[in-house]
Amino acid sequence: MNIDLQAREITPLRNTYDHVARHIGGDKVASRYQEATYGAQPMVNFHYRPTWDPGHELFDASRSKIVLADWYVLKDPRQFYYATWTMTRAKQQDAMEANFQFVEQRGMVGKMPDGVREKALTVLMPLRHAAWGANMNNASICAYGYGTAFTAPAMFHAMDNLGVAQYLTRLGLVLGEPQSLEDGKQAWLDAPEWQGLRRLVEDSFVVSDPFELFVAQNFALDGLLYPLIYGGFVDDHV
């Protein structure tokens, strides 16, 4: 019995979806990021207005004072959509696991000076709660924002901040056992030096404009906190 295999070229009828083509200037080959992002925002045929906010549709651009002529003019330079984001974070998770394993297997925590360990715990453990606040705020931006190019990265960043909180938790368990987490919580609640940051984080929970919250959390707060803590403190003083 002979089997004759022949290659045949199949020409696609179109290169991408119509709703994507409208944003990239015609029927061109679109990237995965473009197909996962452009035109994905629900705009019509909602079943009902939310009972807790009858003044708005489920997805409503009027929740923000900032209104864009094109909601997809915002673009992620990393081209993250769900698949590329998860693959990138998985590789970073593997690297972090290797770092923790390297430290734990060699007993390097026990070789740290007590002063350095205490300083790290005193400064970093309360920041678990700031990272949790950033997670909440970016989840809110995703829930109430408009335009997938704006809301999808906010959800990725929400989960990134949850990861930061988890890494700080693990660091606390490695350096100081469970009591260090409780000490960090009490410092966040009661220590005078943390109350300004805590007030800012908690006040941001009631900001209803997604763009205002985006600027407050991701530009102002993170823009000051990350260089101060993970640059100035961790790199220069620990």
Residue ranges of model-derived segments:
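Terminal targeting/low-complexity segments that flank the catalytic cores of oxidoreductases
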Residues: M1-A130
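Acidic/His metal-coordination segments adjacent to aromatic residues that form catalytic metal sites
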Residues: F102-V123, G184-F219
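His/Met- and acidic-residue-enriched segments that coordinate or traffic transition-metal cofactors
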Residues: F80-Y81, A139, Q166, P227
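Charged/polar, solvent-exposed surface patches and flexible loops
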Residues: A83, M87-A90, D94, A98, ...
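Long, hydrophobic, well-ordered secondary-structure blocks that form the structural core
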Residues: D114-G115, L121-G196
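Short helix/strand-bridging catalytic loops that position acidic/His residues to coordinate divalent metals
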Residues: F156, D236-V238
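Alpha-helical bundle segments that constitute or directly flank the non-heme di-iron/ferroxidase center
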Residues: V44, Y48, D114-G145, S208-D236
